């Protein structure tokens, strides 16, 4: 069963619990700054592991000292769903362990 899109109000409610995350072009987005390129690359690998575990994959971009994510659900027509919120929460939890801010 495909994930159901969240209403605009539901998206705003979820974003209120995810500091640093925002809605941009219909996607949940967040950028993190890390202490080095290696630390950023390590975080990307960790995020990829979580994405595999959840079977839900975001657009994930590695920069010099940065990691950026854009999350939405393809099977829900590109809308934001609870799957996206769960992935954002999991990424937020692991980011602190990588020294991301």
UniProtKB/Swiss-Prot annotation:
Spans through the membrane: none
Keywords: Lyase
One record GO biological process: tetrahydrobiopterin biosynthetic process
EC main group: lyase
E.C. number(s) listed in UniProt: 4.2.1.96
MF GO annotations: 4-alpha-hydroxytetrahydrobiopterin dehydratase activity
Catalytic activity of the protein: (4aS,6R)-4a-hydroxy-L-erythro-5,6,7,8-tetrahydrobiopterin = (6R)-L-erythro-6,7-dihydrobiopterin + H2O
Family: Belongs to the pterin-4-alpha-carbinolamine dehydratase family.
NCBIfam families, A to Z: PRK00823.1-2 (NF002017)
UniProt-listed HAMAP family: Pterin_4_alpha
UniProt protein name: Putative pterin-4-alpha-carbinolamine dehydratase
Source species: Streptomyces coelicolor (strain ATCC BAA-471 / A3(2) / M145)
């Amino acid at each position: 069963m495909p994930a159901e899109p969240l209403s605009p109000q539901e998206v705003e409610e979820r974003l209120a619990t995810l500091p640093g995350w925002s809605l941009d072009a219909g996607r949940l987005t967040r950028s993190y700054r890390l202490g080095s390129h290696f630390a950023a690359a390590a975080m990307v690998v960790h995020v990829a592991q979580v994405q595999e575990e959840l079977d839900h994959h975001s657009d994930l971009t590695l920069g010099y000292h940065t990691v950026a994510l854009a999350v939405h659900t393809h099977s829900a027509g590109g809308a934001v769903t609870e799957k996206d919120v769960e992935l954002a929460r999991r990424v937020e939890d692991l980011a602190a362990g990588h020294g991301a801010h």
